[in-house]
Amino acid sequence: MTLTTHDAALQPGFMVVHGNRLEALRGLAVEWLRRHPLSPLENETILVQSNGISQWLKLALAENEADGGAGIAAALDVTLPARFLWQAYRSVLSQREGEDAVPPVSPFDKPRLVWRLMRLLPALLDAPVFAPLARFLEGDDDLRKRHQLAERLADLFDQYQVYRADWLDAWAAGEDVLITARGEARPLAEAQRWQAELWRVLREDIAADLGEAGLASSRAAVHRRFLAACRELDATNRPPGLPRRVIVFGISSLPAQTLEALAAVARVSQVLLCVHNPCRHYWADIIEHKDLLRAERKRQRRRPGMPADLAETELHLHAQPLLAAWGKQGRDYLRLLDEFDEQQAYRDLFEGEALRIDLFDSPLHHNAEPSLLRQLQDDILELRPLAETRATWPAVDPARDRSLRFQVAHSALREVEILHDQLLAAFSEDPTLRPRDILVMVPDVDQYAAAVQAVFGRLDPDDPRHIPFTLSDQASRHRLPLLIALESLLRLPELRLSVSDLLDLLEVPAVRARFGIPESGLPTLRRWIEGAGIRWGLDARQRQSLDLPGGMAANTWAFGLRRLLLGYAVGDAADGPWQGVEPYDDIGGLEAALAGPLVSLIDTLEAQWQTLAEPCDVATWGERLRELLAACFLAESDQDLMALTRLEQALDAWQESAEEAGLTEPLPLSVVREHWLAQVDEASLSQRFLAGAVNIATLMPMRAIPFRHVCLLGMNDADYPRVQRP
């Protein structure tokens, strides 16, 4: 079906627009939305890979029409591809098979697989095929290894369901093979056969618990049913849950399963993919060394002058080496897109409105100076090999060309200090440069947060050297005071509970509110604690649990509180020690009202210390942790209230997953703590980016967004690319 008229602008179809500049793709997407708006009560559905892209696109839509925007960014449903995909499954299959055709969650979802694997693994380790797992789990007294292994395996099988569903189908049929990209079946290596066997065990266990309906809820099974149902759809029977238009923007790669689903949805919806492609020529078979997969269909043409037939060993000699070395994901994605892209069906529609579907522009337009960075971008755009690059560009003068710079530092703090100095120099050289034009990316923002706060935060806002900044993408457990305090409380059985530990807790407003301690009372408490000789440890028993000899009660919190309370009781009448306790006499008057809340806090910590130290099942842990939240926190701000709500929701989800998995084994605090806090840190589209200051974030959410200055920290060989160890 060819779309050629103005009336066809919102008709169903699968349309792909390529471009080497994300700004150009954004401009086309905004222009398309402006020219072909949906009805007033319809939401636009936009799929993005991160909140950074989402914010950037919304800001462009909100620009005035004179500046290329739509004037407003409203009625937008911006979501992640996986979430949209599951919603599409439910919409289509519910119309065909009934409301319960696709459950809201599946036993094959990663959070539920974790606890099913936790239960199943111990019974499997005696089988010879699981010997590699048995070796890894040796000496696992605190179950930490088993939990980490279960998480990694659940993540692995979750990825297999998206990217290698054909492997899982073969394993479920009893075939220990791997299916290659050409469809060939190769035997699974002996050391990896446990994966196929474990998948079969998981399927049998789910079938025993939930029957065939449980197996039918796997992602691969639902996907097959969805594709079959979509073949029967047409424009007259579009499911009400499917949007009329779906825009996929700024996503660097999508799995074949998602592209299949989008192509199926395109039978009844308009699907527009804006693909960031750095090269105007076909480069899907220009690869490093011999990693060759040729494609029969190609949207783009080969670069003029390139031989039609290349030996595998010569492919990388006819292209820009960065594309050959680092472009594997992009090559695979372009090859997949070529399988679904029928450009002749929509090219006339775009050209009829003076729009292009191939938005490739040289970075050297308008006689721009050929800096080293622009040369590199143009080499990638034109697919120049190194020999041609040397002949094309003049030699670079390092003294004048500052487009690409490298700095070496001996520590993270020194890296940030150099960054701060470089940014001050950049602002001085270019008065038009603003803090929001600068992006700083790090592999792990939590490792650099303290250094950034120390360097960028040491100057007052009215200081001319002050640079406003925002730390985005930080883990909540390292950013929100309530969660930082909760993590400390969840370490009570292993915590020394020093004076600084307790005072850090009292710096948290929700803790002070729970025990009725005003912020103005903290200096008094510090004076009392120092005067009473308190150092660390709840009492002698808690110190003994940390492998110290019994009976060492001096300078504990119990020791100091006895001195404080005795001093308050006897006042000025104190005449030396009473029953071995020297009263602390600097307590009285209105200040004495703080003694009660301090005693209540210490009593609560002692009760929680005793409770948390004992392993128990998931249901009991749920009761304990809710009691901990109620006993130690009272939310007085919206942020604290939201944090407590998320903690409650994470507890509910954990208990539901463990109950479905049939896990009744007692779990230690270490496993519970890491899982609970990690769930609160799960990535979402609610994080704040592009707040008008220097943006400091991890590489993932911001890497595709263009900024005038891009800085990278932490590019150490062991940190990027990061090696994840089990």
Regions found by a protein language model. Name each.
Residues 1-726:
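Polyanion-engaging groove/track-forming segments
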